[in-house]
């Protein structure tokens, strides 16, 4: 096999619901109205995803080779969109897809939804995933509730053409030398914005905060699930993020917003934290824009942002078929193909020595050796933040607090106090 070149497709507009059908679709998902399974008709399994999972080609492959079960993808722009739909229909007791993708940070709350999701434990799948990934999807009773798809080891995406305009190095290795620590990263950014006025250093304050939180062992909760948001590490992240808003390093745009998406086409910023799954998002949003590259570096060492899981809601009509599809989609062979399509790095160690990973390049990112870079970024991760059952809700409050500083509705001190009040209200 020769070198693998990762393809790209334009990302769906944020908040837009797209139902992508591959093959003959005859029914909806687990809302009770679906057909299939009788009179020789195929069962249709709906798979709800968000952002870019790289499943389009896989679904076509499955549907071309299966007459009894067909797959339909229900795709939304962001996890926030998916989350709202998920909890609304969980409360209603019907309407969810047969398979629901869950963002990794939300898994602790999902594990607490007693009886709402099927037990996917299968001894034949022992060892399929990295240990720490499998643990994220396993509840206190030892039941596995989700099958992991990808993981989010992070590097830095950057605009080499804008670096050149600022008189900065553009070579990947030289760029890596500019941002080994957060202090280095911010100092380089201050230099950049002086030389390229009108262009921010990074894409969003919220994205930066997420990147920094991924290096904090206990950002919001202690290991016994006690909420502690007044710890020194979290306050240091807050001060760094809001302080650099005031210095002008941030776009002040909310990640996933329409304005944020549009900024990719307007020289809006020069760098952003990029887990593997973000590469497809960048390439889609920045379609037609030359100059993007991907550096083998992450300030402060390493970090993992995201990664997702496939779950099977118990309210579905075809849970056994859904389990079969979820198993197939998360097998190493399929996740390698998803990586080739969208850059989503597999959570299955058996994939790591595959030539499709080790030789992978990405044409959009100046033929960067993304497989090699992401594999090395994985080795740099030394901290897995503790995420208790309230992590996702507290993170949402933290991001809202940052947004208030971005839009000028509150100064950093007042917004921090509002954050503390909001967290207390969570109970």
Put a short name on every predicted segment.
Residues 186-190, 224-254:
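Glycine-centered hinge/linker elements that transmit conformational signals in sensory
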Residues 42-44, 49-106:
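Early extracytoplasmic/lumenal segment of secretory-pathway proteins
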Residues 75-86, 103-106, 178-184, 252-266:
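Short helix-initiation/N-cap motifs at beta->coil->alpha
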Residues 1-44, 421-427:
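Short, low-complexity disordered leader/linker segments with a strong preference
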Residues 103-155, 293-294, 362:
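Hinge/lid segment of periplasmic solute-binding proteins
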Residues 366-422:
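C-terminal capping/gating helix-and-loop segments adjacent to ligand/active sites or protein-protein/ligand interfaces
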Residues 32-45, 63-69, 141-143, 186, ...:
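Immediate post-signal peptide segment of exported/extracytoplasmic ligand-binding proteins
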Residues 247, 284-345:
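Extracytoplasmic/periplasmic substrate-recognition and gating elements
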């Amino acid at each position: 096999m020769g070198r693998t070149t990762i393809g790209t497709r334009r990302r769906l507009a944020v908040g837009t619901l797209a139902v992508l059908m591959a093959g003959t679709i005859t029914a909806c998902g687990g809302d009770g109205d679906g057909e299939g399974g009788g009179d020789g008709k195929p069962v249709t399994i709906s798979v709800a995803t968000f952002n870019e999972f790289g499943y389009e080609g896989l679904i076509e492959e499955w549907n071309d080779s299966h007459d009894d079960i067909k797959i339909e993808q229900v795709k939304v722009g962001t996890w926030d969109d998916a989350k709202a739909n998920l909890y609304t229909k969980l409360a209603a007791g019907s309407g969810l897809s047969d398979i629901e993708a869950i963002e990794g940070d939300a898994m602790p709350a999902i594990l607490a939804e007693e009886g709402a999701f099927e037990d996917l434990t299968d001894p034949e799948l022992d060892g399929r995933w990295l240990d720490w990934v499998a643990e994220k999807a396993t509840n206190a009773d030892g039941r596995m509730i989700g099958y992991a798809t990808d993981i989010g080891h992070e590097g830095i995406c950057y605009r080499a053409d804008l670096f050149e305009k600022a008189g900065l190095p553009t070579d990947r290795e030289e760029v890596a030398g500019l941002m080994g620590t957060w202090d280095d990263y911010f100092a380089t950014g201050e230099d950049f914005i002086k030389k390229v006025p009108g262009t921010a250093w990074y894409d969003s304050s919220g994205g930066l905060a997420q990147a920094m939180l991924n290096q904090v062992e206990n950002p919001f909760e202690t290991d016994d699930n006690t909420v502690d948001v007044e710890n020194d590490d979290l306050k240091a992240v807050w001060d760094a993020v809001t302080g650099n808003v005031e210095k002008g390093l941030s776009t002040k745009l909310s990640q996933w917003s329409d304005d944020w998406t549009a900024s990719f086409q307007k020289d809006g910023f020069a760098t952003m934290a990029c887990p593997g799954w973000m590469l497809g998002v960048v390439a889609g949003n920045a379609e037609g824009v030359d100059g993007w590259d991907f550096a083998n570096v992450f300030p402060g060492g390493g970090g993992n942002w995201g990664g997702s899981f496939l779950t099977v809601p118990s309210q579905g009509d075809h849970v056994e078929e859904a389990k079969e599809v979820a198993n197939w989609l998360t097998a190493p062979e399929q996740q390698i193909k998803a990586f080739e399509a969208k850059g989503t790095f597999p959570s299955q160690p058996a994939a790591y020595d595959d030539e499709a990973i080790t030789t992978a390049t990405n044409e959009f990112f100046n033929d960067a050796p993304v497989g090699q870079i992401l594999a090395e970024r994985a080795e740099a991760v030394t901290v897995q933040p503790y995420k208790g059952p309230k992590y996702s809700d507290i993170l949402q409050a933290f991001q809202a607090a940052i947004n208030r500083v971005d839009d000028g509705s509150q100064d950093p001190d007042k917004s921090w106090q509002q954050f503390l009040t909001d967290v207390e209200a969570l109970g």
